[in-house]
Amino acid sequence: MSRPQGGGGLSRRRLLERWWILPVAATAGAFGYMGYYASRVTFGKKGVGAPDFRPRPAQKLAALSDLNAEWSEVNFTYDARPCTLLRVPQSVPGGLDAPGSVRLAAFSRVCTHLGCAVNLVRDPEVLAFAFNYRAGPQDQHPQLGCRCHYSVFDPVRGGEAMFGKATLPLPRVRLEVRGNDVYATGIEPAPTLST
């Protein structure tokens, strides 16, 4: 018994002749999305803008004498967020130039990618090996690195995202010097985490 010719339906033969369309379309879609994501992560990083501090109660962080050398670090919690205070070698956008040529910057330690904690990575070779990031000759200094997905933030550039999946800079903490002590008096809002 044969089927009538000229039927407009999808026959088994036609289906088998065109089965390849599905995996090709899926592969093209996957590669298209990966290309979009890679370009967004590589070229879509936001620069550091003017500080947008929200006032918060003053909190003593450290004495200036505790930050006696460049890249001295004090970790603290402010506005329910883990943060870090750094003595940096030059003025930083959103940082503080304290008396005696002391330059300070403080950042939230919550990575702007998925919220893991960032830490100060002092050794450029560790950044190159563990984070697959080698800074240029002018940026051979400690960086803030997230070990979850290997994002790197430059404290000298105001916490700007330099490498990895994070596209937004770290929120900055407003600093003040009162006498010989450093205080936090405000913090930038936490960004919506990226994916």
What does each model-identified segment do?
Residues 2-3, 98, 133, 162:
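A general structural-boundary detector
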